[in-house]
Amino acid sequence: MEKLRILICDGNTEADRASFKKFVGCAPSKQFESLLKNYNSQIRTEIAFPADPGPLMTLPLGAYDGILITGSNSHIYEAQPGNLRQIEFAQKAFASGTPMFGVCWGMQLAVVAAGGEVLPSRVADCSCETPFATGVELTSYGSGHPMHHSRTSGFDVFSFHSDEVTRLPGGAVVTARNRNFIQAVEIKHGRSTFWGVQYHPELSGWDQAGFLRESARSLVEDGSYETLNHVEHAAQAISMFKAGAQISEENLVHFEGVDTNSFEFRPLEILNWLDHLVIPTAKRKFGWGGGWLQK
């Protein structure tokens, strides 16, 4: 029985991975590894750290069935060595013919590697879109796109970013957006197809609370929250947010503008990437079929 081989690329530096481990319990790459293996035990994962100096200990990128790029605390427009290494890696990934997926930083990295542009948020009242992206709407192209299969046409979702896509590369199509930002794209570049989202469909309320605590000081500095206590109060409220949970009246302030009754917690885009892009590509590329049991 065949197993998919997925390369998970953590977008964070070593220091930031340690910070996430302190506040969330693990680095983002480990979160994605757990998500994939919980979805289907037939998935084999490898984790790489393309921001780190030194050679990557991976197979040739074309040998993988999928390449998944996590979020990051980094800013792609800063000419840091780790950023430049990741751009070079993403360019090689596009040349490999392997399906790609990116979340938040992962989408921004793919946009830049394919020739687009990412800059700090230009939205006056939204320097950092967190803890939620509200009013996300599928575009006409996105409404029929398999990445968003089973997603309602309008939705709210966990989010955490202070940068935005300001220019798309050639071969890119927007599949979702809200009033402030491009929220999802497909990019066909080189030999690979990339699907990606600006928001964080992989997170639980508990995870998002950890993200808030990890970035508490920067959230106060950029004006997203008034004090560290405000960040902590928000984190406590969001940590309890899950399907069917009732929001207490005192915590409603942290969910302003969010439709908590229809909030979608499933990581749909990631699972759809596996089912609708990775698996069909692997069957064509490697000539196998019939062994994969889809859930």
Curated annotation (Swiss-Prot):
Residues covered by the Glutamine amidotransferase type-1 domain: 5-221
Keywords, ordered alphabetically: Hydrolase
Catalytic activity, as annotated: gamma-L-glutamyl-L-alaninol + H2O = L-alaninol + L-glutamate
Main EC class the enzyme belongs to: hydrolase
E.C. number(s) listed in UniProt: 3.4.-.-
InterPro entries with a match to the protein in the record: ChyE-like, Class_I_gatase-like, GATASE
Function: Involved in the degradation of isopropylamine, which is a constituent of the herbicides atrazine. Catalyzes the hydrolysis of gamma-glutamyl-L-alaninol (GALO) to L-alaninol and L-glutamate. It can also uses gamma-glutamyl-isopropylamide, gamma-glutamyl-ethylamide, L-glutamine, and gamma-glutamyl-p-nitroanilide.
Superkingdom to which the source organism belongs: Bacteria
Gene3D superfamilies on file: 3.40.50.880
Location of the active site: C104, H200, E202
GO MF annotations in UniProt: hydrolase activity
GO CC terms, sorted: cytosol
Recorded phenotype for the gene knockout or disruption: Cells lacking this gene are unable to transform isopropylamine to L-alaninol.
Name by which UniProt lists this protein: Gamma-glutamyl-L-1-hydroxyisopropylamide hydrolase
